[in-house]
Amino acid sequence: MIVTNFAYGTGPYLRTTDLAIAFNDELQRNKKPRMRILVPWVYGEKQRRVMLEEFRDYDLGYPGEILLDAELGSMLRRVFYGGGPYRDALEKWTKQCQTVSQETHRHLSGRFEAQTLSGGTVEVNGQDIAVELSRSPRVRYDVAPSYFSSFAYVGEILERASSIALHRVGRDVLRKGVEAANWVEEHQTMRFIAYPATFGYFKTWEPRYPGDSLAPPLVPPTRSNTENIKPGVFVTVTGIPGLERLYAEATRLGIALYSNEHEQVPGSERQSPHVIPNKNILLQFARAGWSSIWISMLAGTPLVIPPFDLDDDPEIHFNNVSVKELELGIIYGGQTLESLIMEGPRLKESYDNIKRRILEKFDTLDGNRYCAKL
């Protein structure tokens, strides 16, 4: 059995599941049996809905292979950032990291129940866990060899954050955060850091731990989308000052608004992120998380991100710098929608150049398959 371990948010649980699927496909290609995939069920029915939307076809082909563990999810939720000032979440994590790690270890070492994506109940024996696949994990399970893949080390992010004044996290809390992150991150069997990613704008890459390797973007290749939709903008981030004006401008220009959270975007139509590669999606508005950044880059759909909020995770500050320096998107600063759309050709050319460099280095754009083979 494979167990996944990830950070807060939607992208991490989707992308670790993608990696687990790639791992299983590689096992099958080598004539070895596939393994069940145990996913922490952190976000309740919303997570199940999102995973069904993302992996419906896969679940039909391999029914019951993906399992959701609510008890494990509730443990991770206690150390996750879930809104409010990041400093509060960081302080909570530093205090509970080792305690929650011990709890997850005990849980995963025994017998427990999990659910299939379709809602069936399955009894699981933790002794069957053979491998852990993690993405920027916040705890240690210590039940099987752990394979780490991420956009950066949290320990390095917090170390570098202590030297800038662009956030509201005290140095003492940052220091404790570095200690907690190092305790988790140094205990990994194999490690991959993606390119481009959080510190991709550095001129040279230096491994943090012996055996560190670079990998292509840790998302599946985007699939073409030919749905007949009106020209529009896909919105995956809300609550940013000024976006309401852009929504009104879109209406005036006859440009549609699409979102997977359409209740939070006035006048929008609900669509899955799978439409982002559609030629009629003119822009994607998203927080600077790497799932969104890589999807825009691979799809060739220009990305617009909000400026860094001083109360947010310092990772986002460095992500924004990388997006700007590598020409992966535009930081929103009150521009008109028309001016943002006009930046599209420049960004698409930049995306093509970056993809060419990735292919020259790795011979693939698919970081999950790349890591699974190693």
Describe each PLM feature range.
Residues 4-18:
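A short, glycine/small-residue-rich beta-strand->loop->alpha-helix junction that serves as a flexible
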Residues 15, 19-22, 210-265:
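Conserved catalytic-core segment of nucleotide-activated headgroup transferases in glycan assembly
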Residues 32-103:
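Conserved nucleotide-sugar phosphate-binding/catalytic loop shared by glycosyltransferases and other
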Residues 32-44, 191-197, 256-261, 304:
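Short internal beta-strands
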Residues 102-137:
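Short N-terminal targeting/anchoring amphipathic segment
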Residues 131, 139-213, 325:
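Active-site-proximal region of nucleotide-activated glycan assembly enzymes
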Residues 258-302:
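Donor nucleotide-activated moiety binding/catalytic core segment of transferases
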Residues 291-356:
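Catalytic binding pocket for nucleotide-activated donors in carbohydrate/polymer assembly enzymes
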